[in-house]
């Protein structure tokens, strides 16, 4: 079940990046699907910072149904909804930067995305992974806990420099395992949470 869900999710990520839209199916982990565009995926990645993936998915679904950004964030139970609404509106205004990033290779794309208010290393990497990039790591608390369990020392504070150092470790592990960072991230997340989301 987990392997099949990971494979399906990777295909959905690629489709979103190639065609600009996709319907993510989260069954059997959550009993709903979410239609996504590049724009709503960017909003989703901003919404999930310091909030739950499930709240972010509910937000994205509401956004796709035509509910306004701030109202959708509030209804979905996303933490810090006022600040995130501002970040998402600014990101939508800066969408030319997103388009430019999507034309660049992953490390350059992430640098470009970091110019958008509300996107840090994790959020920019999350967005890139979710549009089909398989060579960036989303370093969240689940990944850090997993690394600690594997005997790695993890930083207490995540600067951009430390993010890249941890990403390099994850890249080495993924190469040893014969899988992409995107696949490994989903597998670790499933191990830590019991779910394959995004």
UniProtKB/Swiss-Prot annotation:
Q: Which Pfam families match?
A: Ogg-HhH (PF22175)
Q: Where is this site: Important for guanine/8-oxoguanine distinction?
A: 198
Would the keyword Lyase turn up in this protein's UniProt record?
yes
Quote the protein name from its UniProt record.
8-oxoguanine DNA glycosylase/AP lyase
Question: What keywords were assigned to this record?
Answer: DNA damage, DNA repair, Glycosidase, Hydrolase, Lyase, Multifunctional enzyme
Membership in a protein family = Belongs to the type-2 OGG1 family.
**Biological role stated in the UniProt entry:** Catalyzes the excision of an oxidatively damaged form of guanine (7,8-dihydro-8-oxoguanine = 8-oxoG) from DNA. Also cleaves the DNA backbone at apurinic/apyrimidinic sites (AP sites). Efficiently cleaves oligomers containing 8-oxoG:C and 8-oxoG:G base pairs, and is less effective on oligomers containing 8-oxoG:T and 8-oxoG:A mispairs.
Oligomeric state and interaction partners are given as: Monomer.
């Amino acid at each position: 079940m987990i392997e099949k869900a990971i494979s399906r999710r990777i295909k959905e990520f690629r489709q979103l990046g190639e065609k600009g839209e996709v319907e993510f199916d989260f069954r059997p982990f959550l009993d709903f699907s979410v239609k996504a565009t590049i724009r709503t995926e960017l909003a989703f990645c901003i919404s999930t910072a310091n909030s739950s993936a499930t709240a972010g998915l509910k937000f994205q679904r509401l956004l796709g149904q035509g509910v306004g950004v701030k109202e959708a964030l509030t209804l979905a139970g996303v933490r810090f909804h006022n600040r995130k609404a501002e970040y998402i509106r600014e990101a939508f205004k800066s969408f030319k930067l997103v388009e430019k990033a999507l034309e660049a290779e992953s490390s350059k794309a992430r640098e470009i995305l970091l110019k958008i208010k509300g996107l840090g290393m994790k959020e920019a990497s999350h967005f890139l992974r979710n549009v089909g990039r398989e060579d960036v790591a989303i370093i969240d608390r689940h990944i850090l806990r997993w690394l600690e369990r594997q005997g790695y020392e993890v930083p207490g504070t995540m600067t951009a420099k430390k993010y890249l150092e941890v990403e390099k470790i994850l890249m080495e592990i993924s190469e040893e395992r014969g899988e992409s960072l995107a696949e490994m991230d989903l597998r670790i997340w499933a191990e830590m949470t019991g779910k394959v989301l995004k």
